Amino acid sequence: MMNFLRRRLSDSSFIANLPNGYMTDLQRPEPQQPPPPPPPGPGAASASAAPPTASPGPERRPPPASAPAPQPAPTPSVGSSFFSSLSQAVKQTAASAGLVDAPAPAPAAARKAKVLLVVDEPHADWAKCFRGKKVLGDYDIKVEQAEFSELNLVAHADGTYAVDMQVLRNGTKVVRSFRPDFVLIRQHAFGMAENEDFRHLIIGMQYAGLPSINSLESIYNFCDKPWVFAQLVAIYKTLGGEKFPLIEQTYYPNHKEMLTLPTFPVVVKIGHAHSGMGKVKVENHYDFQDIASVVALTQTYATAEPFIDSKYDIRVQKIGNNYKAYMRTSISGNWKTNTGSAMLEQIAMSDRYKLWVDTCSEMFGGLDICAVKAVHGKDGKDYIFEVMDCSMPLIGEHQVEDRQLITELVISKMNQLLSRTPALSPQRPLTTQQPQSGTLKDPDSSKTPPQRPPPQGGPGQPQGMQPPGKVLPPRRLPPGPSLPPSSSSSSSSSSSAPQRPGGPTTHGDAPSSSSSLAEAQPPLAAPPQKPQPHPQLNKSQSLTNAFSFSESSFFRSSANEDEAKAETIRSLRKSFASLFSD
């Protein structure tokens, strides 16, 4: 019999022919059957039959009743267990056939951490600096630190992106993907010394719309020192040589124009390099021609500026609103103060230095972290020759303080930018079944379409709410004197109005309505004259309400199809009644 039912119910045409909202109450919890009252003894019967009057004396007081013996738990009948297994078979068969919307997955937990990507060398532990910090109120900061050489990424035009990072696990390099919310760049994105060209990663971050310090646009512009020097030339023309003493410089796009210079010695800088690399001091015209031949092999640009016999170098840095000035003096006598031995000390911050760094911090839309480098010559004059961005190295005795300043600056920028740019979550379909109709389901449960019939066994619906051609199966009401039979007249709808608070019946309030009806029944003091419905009848009734289909599903059809469906249901009910009746 079960195999027959499984084959019958696995047929997609069987469930597809069910009318809208027909199988609903199988998902409701089964009402607990009250335990049968214990058989009253003759003394208890006479006591219950006597009116509750005051006892005139202690001799007429009834003896205390002994505690009733615990009654055994009611054993489920064979029909009840059979219908339970049949209900499970119906659910499994319909779910495997794809006729029921898959339950929506539980929503993912809200992200309680923002991912910060720090591009820096491994000697700086930025995770320690951000430990315990929070952004946007209650979001932790998860730090992912790597060098440019360990990173890769993919970005899409819709704003989705993913960053791949190589990490060492048990001595083996593996790739791990994550999605950063903010980027702090503390490493040069381009350098010709070791073919370190990571501008494609900067482009990818800009493509993904990642906020960063400094801005990705400024970082890309700093990948060519002559381009940055052109901005210094514009500042020099605006402020003048007294306020902004910029060194003289000549730019050569290639070696062809490197013929001669009027004065020597000069410093030739080839290409874009850092830490003094690619810089050559040229004493005469012959050495300059030799350098021009080297530039021809590099196939890049070069600049030449007069050599300044310096007493010390000056570095003025700005991190947010914090300013520091340093002086570096060479001890070994090398013309490059960063080569050999040198003495570094912090000096007072003057208004002149502050003007330099404040003016340079406005280039390329604003620099949150920058530094101005200058040379103080033996002639007593200052010469500005370079500006560094957020990739500047930290120097001096206050490196820990500078890292703390950068940490606070990053947190401030994350609170400012991430609040306006929430992270995009990948959109995933919640249901596997697509509705055939073009209408969308109304989230408001009070706006129930008129063609939806009430759940079987629930409170009645006015006649005007029933669709034409819909044949409703007979309703079985629980026994009770307070529940009048349902009819199609207007008096029936008005009499059932007090039992239907809150408008039309929906799936959400069907269990509460049935429970309120059950509470309205008075308890039976005497043995009932009408037998209670058999559990099998309740089960057969609930079998037709196994699933809850939405208004936008595929069960809408014309009146003729509704009549055919109703005829199928009537024949099905007759089959169940003949199969499972006693």
From Swiss-Prot:
The keyword NADP does not apply. Residues 31-42, 63-75, 475-484, 524-534 have a biased composition (Pro residues). Residues 113-420 are annotated as: C. Residues 458-533 are annotated as: H. It comes from the Eukaryota. GO terms for cellular component: glutamatergic synapse; plasma membrane; postsynaptic density; Schaffer collateral - CA1 synapse; SNARE complex; synapse; synaptic vesicle membrane. Can form oligomers with SYN1. Interacts with CAPON. Neuronal phosphoprotein that coats synaptic vesicles, binds to the cytoskeleton, and is believed to function in the regulation of neurotransmitter release. May play a role in noradrenaline secretion by sympathetic neurons. Phosphorylation at Ser-10 dissociates synapsins from synaptic vesicles. Phosphorylation at Ser-425 by MAPK1/ERK2 and/or MAPK3/ERK1 may play a role in noradrenaline secretion by sympathetic neurons. The gene is SYN2. Gene3D superfamilies: 3.40.50.20, ATP-grasp fold, A domain (3.30.1490.20), ATP-grasp fold, B domain (3.30.470.20). Keywords: Phosphoprotein, Schizophrenia, Synapse. Residues 33-112 are annotated as: B. The modification Phosphothreonine is found at residue 421. Central and peripheral nervous systems. This is Synapsin-2. InterPro entries: ATP_grasp_subdomain_1, PreATP-grasp_dom_sf, Synapsin, Synapsin_ATP-bd_dom, Synapsin_CS, Synapsin_P_site, Synapsin_pre-ATP-grasp_dom. Belongs to the synapsin family. It is found in: Synapse. GO terms for molecular function: ATP binding; identical protein binding.
